[in-house]
Amino acid sequence: MQTEQLLLKIIEQTHLTSSEMQQLFTSIIQGELNPIQLTALLITLKIRGESAEEISGAVAACLNAAQPFPTPDYAFADIVGTGGDSANTINISTASAIVGAACGLKIAKHGNRSVSSKTGSSDLLTALGVNINMPADIARRALDEIGLCFLFAQQYHLGFKHAVPVRQALKTRTIFNILGPLINPARPKRQLLGVYSPHLLKPYAETVAQLGHQHTFVVHGCGLDEVAIHGRTDVAEIYDGKITYYSLSPLDFGFQAKPLESLRGGEPAENAQMITALLQGQGKPEHAQAVAMNTALLMKLFGYENIKHNAQQVLDVIQSGKSVNVLSQLTRY
């Protein structure tokens, strides 16, 4: 089917199949849609909502076009959120990736510039002295040797540049925000994925199930694309294609709820200062709690089933200062 026909189907409120969406998104990545066509597509999808079939088709197109990364044969995971929750918190996922590596996990962190906060994962890591543009073979070596690497989305998904002017002009969340966490070029089968809206939990989980991930958590925590320290976290757990929905509270991790305001972030330099203090074991208790809760769930992907025990173990690792050593090693690649 021609691109124009596929566009017309979407504008007429018809859902595309996965293969149709893959074809259409391949056209976007190759720069074949003009700005008016792309705007119509993005806004129509946003208003009616993207189906799991459509998201999985777009993911397939993006991964097929991505620059290659040598996927490891050992167990590794990613922890990443859609962004776009407008909460402007510290970089919980990035800090959790570093702490997770200090706990002995293998984490290939996929990330980009900021979406809704002042500081995205790549902004923070740059401020911390990490080379976010390291070649794929060097990033893979870091993952092998220290258990952590960062894959900068713009380096691997070159075709996204064709959509940048339209996305900047629209100034609203689109399917591109939804795709980010699902298109890690390392292709992890284990992921902790945060979404900016509770309405995304179900389509995201169904997409993950279609993509054949081994074990994944999709979370939304009281307005955050993270596990929440301030209230309930809605969870979709996908294990070997089966989806289970439930909720978690800070008490499940052994903590009392803390105010969201305590996680407020700032510019990259400010966030880097706060995250460095955290990794040294000298950060705010609320920051340590947020990272402990998210890393505890991340550990469950590797078979550590008791999240309360995991959270305490993470706090011990944070206090030990091991995490800042992992960061220091990463800056040398």
Curated annotation (Swiss-Prot):
E.C. numbers: 2.4.2.18
**Does Magnesium show up as a keyword for this record?**
yes
Provide the cofactor list for this protein.
Mg(2+)
Where is Mg(2+) 2 bound in this sequence?
D225, E226
Which positions are annotated as binding anthranilate 2?
R167
Q: Which GO terms describe its molecular function?
A: anthranilate phosphoribosyltransferase activity; magnesium ion binding
Q: Where does 5-phospho-alpha-D-ribose 1-diphosphate bind?
A: 81, 84-85, 89, 91-94, 109-117, 121
Pathway membership of this protein? Amino-acid biosynthesis; L-tryptophan biosynthesis; L-tryptophan from chorismate: step 2/5
Kindly list the positions annotated as binding Mg(2+) 1.
S93, E226
Instruction: Locate the residues binding anthranilate 1.
Output: G81, N112
**Enzyme class at the top of the EC tree:** transferase
Which family does the record claim for this protein?
Belongs to the anthranilate phosphoribosyltransferase family.
Q: What does this protein do?
A: Catalyzes the transfer of the phosphoribosyl group of 5-phosphorylribose-1-pyrophosphate (PRPP) to anthranilate to yield N-(5'-phosphoribosyl)-anthranilate (PRA).
Q: Which NCBIfam families match?
A: trpD
How this chain assembles, per its entry, is: Homodimer.
Name recorded for this polypeptide: Anthranilate phosphoribosyltransferase
* Source taxonomy: Bacteria, Pseudomonadati, Pseudomonadota, Gammaproteobacteria, Pasteurellales
